[in-house]
Amino acid sequence: MVFGIPASAAELDGRRERGEAMLNRITADEGRMVVESLSDISPELGDWIIEFAYGDVFSDTELSLCTRELATVSALTALGNARPQLKVHIDGALNVGCSPDAIVAVIIQMAVYSGFPSALNGVSAAREVFADRGVGVTTANSRTGER
């Protein structure tokens, strides 16, 4: 049963298979480690991450994976209290082809909606991920073109 709706084992198997493949594609080992870390306290939460978040939502093809990851980075930045998840999804955005500049741009956009502290914290998280990955951003001011 998924959200109170009876589901066949084949449907659940398909969701899990899709979810595991998508989780691996976006987050590589980090996502798997998060799910595994839940096995001793809340394995069902790990199942929901795989089957719902990645098997249903992230596997939907209406948005590109880059767009989906940028939306996720925006939301996690705006929350302001999800730094570990934000770093995983910044890394995931890079994994699916988002540019570092686009990632920073959506984080900066959140200053308007969730405040400068959340945007500053988001930029700090991005800086760490970029340093770990050895990637940089274009430092030009997009309004003036100055470097």
Regions from the PLM with identified roles:
Residues 64, 82-104, 117-129:
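Extended intrinsically disordered, low-complexity coil regions enriched in Ser, Thr, Gly, Ala
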Residues 47-50, 80-86:
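Short acidic alpha-helix initiation/capping motifs at coil-to-helix transition points
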Residues 3-66, 95, 120-147:
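Acidic, glycine/proline-rich low-complexity segments that act as flexible tails and inter-domain linkers
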Residues 104, 108, 140-142:
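Alpha-helical transmembrane segments and their immediate juxtamembrane flanks
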